[in-house]
């Protein structure tokens, strides 16, 4: 078994400065994620943290965004953060966990993957 981690950090202002936020959200987030963002009053901190989480997963997979689509990974916020990954596309991933944090103008996310050898 292999363990990999990925991390990402982003200034909230980078998301605030996006010209067409709705278009960006539809490109990056699933319907369920958009519903969660709406429940948080479209908080820029929430959007930034969730975006960082997707980037952190792509780094842990060593694919970057491109081979991994934004829609291949979903953050579900029911009882804490649960991350779902498209296992058809990434069958070697046995388990995934992530954490998102915010502090002032920054959001950061970290992801840990367990993979088959």
Curated annotation (Swiss-Prot):
Binding-site list for Mg(2+): 8, 55
Keywords assigned by UniProt, alphabetized: Cytoplasm, Fatty acid biosynthesis, Fatty acid metabolism, Lipid biosynthesis, Lipid metabolism, Magnesium, Metal-binding, Transferase
Principal EC category: transferase
Main localization of the protein described in the UniProt heading: cytoplasm
Entry EC no(s): 2.7.8.7
Record's keyword annotation contains Lipid biosynthesis: yes
Protein name: Holo-[acyl-carrier-protein] synthase
Compartments reported by the entry: Cytoplasm
TM segment ranges: none
Family as reported in the entry's similarity comment: Belongs to the P-Pant transferase superfamily. AcpS family.
Requisite cofactors: Mg(2+)
GO MF annotation list: holo-[acyl-carrier-protein] synthase activity; magnesium ion binding
Source organism (scientific name): Finegoldia magna (strain ATCC 29328 / DSM 20472 / WAL 2508) (Peptostreptococcus magnus)
GO cellular component, one term: cytoplasm
Catalytic activity: apo-[ACP] + CoA = holo-[ACP] + adenosine 3',5'-bisphosphate + H(+)
UniProt key word Membrane: no
GO biological process: fatty acid biosynthetic process
Any Pfam family hit: ACPS
Xref: NCBIfam families: acpS, pantethn_trn
Protein role: Transfers the 4'-phosphopantetheine moiety from coenzyme A to a Ser of acyl-carrier-protein.
